[in-house]
From Swiss-Prot:
A single cellular component GO annotation: plasma membrane
Pfam families from the UniProt entry: KdpA
Transmembrane residue ranges: 5-25, 27-47, 63-83, 132-152, 170-190, 253-273, 283-303, 327-347, 356-376, 379-399, 416-436, 484-504, 524-544
Keyword Kinase part of the UniProt annotation: no
Protein name (Swiss-Prot/TrEMBL): Potassium-transporting ATPase potassium-binding subunit
Species in which this protein is naturally found: Salmonella typhi
Compartment(s) where it occurs, according to its Swiss-Prot or TrEMBL record: Cell inner membrane
Amino acid sequence: MAAQGFLLIASFLLILLVLAKPLGSGLARLIAAVPLPGVAGVERILWRTLGITDHEMNWRQYLLALLTLNLLGLGILFCLLFWQEWLPLNPQRLPGLSWDLALNTAVSFVTNTNWQAYSGESTLSYFSQMAGLTVQNFLSAATGIAVVFALIRAFTRQNVHTLGNAWQDLVRITLWILFPVALIIALFFIQQGVPQNLSAYQPITTLEGAKQLLPMGPVASQEAIKMLGTNGGGFFNANSSHPFENPTALTNLAQMLAIFLIPAALCFAFGEAAGDRRQGRALLWAMSFIFVVCVAVVMWAEVQGNPHLLAAGADSSVNMEGKEARFGVLASSLFAVVTTAASCGAVNAMHDSFTALGGMVPMWLMQIGEVVFGGVGSGLYGMLLFVLLAVFIAGLMIGRTPEYLGKKIDVREMKMTALAILVTPMLVLLGSALAMMTDAGRSAMLNPGPHGFSEVLYAVSSAANNNGSAFAGLSANSPFWNCLLAFCMFVGRFGVIIPVMAIAGSLVSKKVQPASQGTLATHGALFIGLLIGTVLLVGALTFIPALALGPVAEHFSLP
């Protein structure tokens, strides 16, 4: 089993790096505002048609453009969901959503969280899925990438005040990166058996003679961008454990690769844009190290399983509960770590059924800020926040003003960095405390004891860090939970983006200082270790007490 796990991890990472490297080169061209080959003429027509100028924006204008787009999308999506019954492509005549569920779902998909307090096949029409959720899957992913584009330009430019044109970046990211790659993935899914139609649900008779209604819909097109954009919201309630979303071992591998593809490519793009590819590789090494360790821990925990299974007469203690037999323990464990290391949230197994330690690792990966590869764009700018914190700590130790890529890191940057890093832990801890203190919060818990608390902690962690996966066991479709999690999702997304853009605006105006003998090298093994230690230290200090009350207590309660 150990050899199989090692081969699975190694082959996954090898294929990922082979695919991510060329995509990173394309992203680097977009960061430099250089059109991809053959599209310059098309872009000129698009800019004239859409009324987009070449005028570059400062950080406030860039941020305002992104916020305007996302708030407009939030309002439109809320209306689509609330008045769903009056809109076309609703063959099952599904009613509109309640105001609190519509708000929660709209915020969820606009913020790239894709938390779902509903069952897709029994709640949403095809129009809501296509014109509402799928559109936001593209736009939320493009928003995250645009933010990291602006931050990278802040490091590579000097003595200016502009970070690019947000509208041009959004169009280029959507048309030349997200759409073509998603199209290729969708066609592959269709070839593997994922439905793509607008047919009404199909009544069938099973082999046992029972009647069943099979849901249909444009699944493949939404599934592709769901994974590529690290969105994660399933067309069906069972998400990627549903055979119509994830029918084969090949689609399972393709989905995991799609989740990490753009986050890994952005590391390569960062190195190219910075003029030193070692900088991007250093971040990739740090992410990969944490990722491999986490996968190994989850695989070990799930293979060791639960001793209660043997006592109940099972043939093995290996924890197959909540997992698809066609994927098995190892592939399910790898998928769980991939989807929570990135801010995706898609699942091919029920995380609530993992062992205590096996479920704690995905929860902790979310709590450290989704920086181990992370979401498209958000993962890299989140890790760069920890880079700034790491160089600040190193500067304190050696008595020098901290700097990164030749840019001095001053008080303003550190204030914004601290603010951005503290946003999600505050949301998680205060939100979980509020839920446990109120009757409305506790009434949704279906399990008592440490596991029940773990379900609450996981839900708030998932929302605040824009992941979207769930432990289940929590009746979250209530006004209290819909509003609480919507608030956590919105602030967890834009409460980080705003200080990140402020950091970009401050850095872009600074001069690049030449390296000296006292300059800390930020591409070697020493800095990689310092960066990993910073991430682990912040995560440990912040969440160990809460984790001790949940999964740790549950683990030690086993015989």
